[in-house]
Regions:
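Positively charged, low-complexity terminal tracts
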Residues: 1-113
């Protein structure tokens, strides 16, 4: 698929201190997951309009794909077309990058959201 899938449901993106909170209803979270999967599976090498060394990305705009009071969201591939290089200054998440780090999970305490 050349075009990204549509964003459905409700998604909100907002800064909260040193964090970015991404919240959504079930449909919104599922469509965001589909968009991330699309971006991950995208064959950057076959994108003639994407220059070598650049990275595929999509923008989600407040009042359009995400809630009107959201902060604009840009979702990007880290690996550059042609080189696979990550951006200068990138720092790995350590164990999480190898699939062994689990996110903290807060189900019942709204103060942890």
């Amino acid at each position: 698929m050349d075009k990204p899938p549509p964003v459905c449901g409700n998604i909100e993106v907002e800064p909260c201190g040193q964090r970015i909170v991404v919240a959504g209803d079930p449909a919104g979270l599922r469509s965001l997951a589909e968009l991330l999967t699309w971006l991950a599976d995208l064959d950057q090498e076959s994108m003639a309009h994407l220059p070598e060394g650049e990275r595929a990305h999509v923008h989600l705009y407040p009042g359009s794909q995400i809630s009107g009071n959201s902060t604009e969201l840009e979702l990007c591939r880290l690996d550059a077309k042609g080189t696979g290089a990550f951006p200068r200054g990138f720092e790995s998440a350590g164990d999480q990058a190898r699939g062994t780090g689990y996110p903290e999970w807060f189900m019942d305490d709204p103060d942890n959201l």
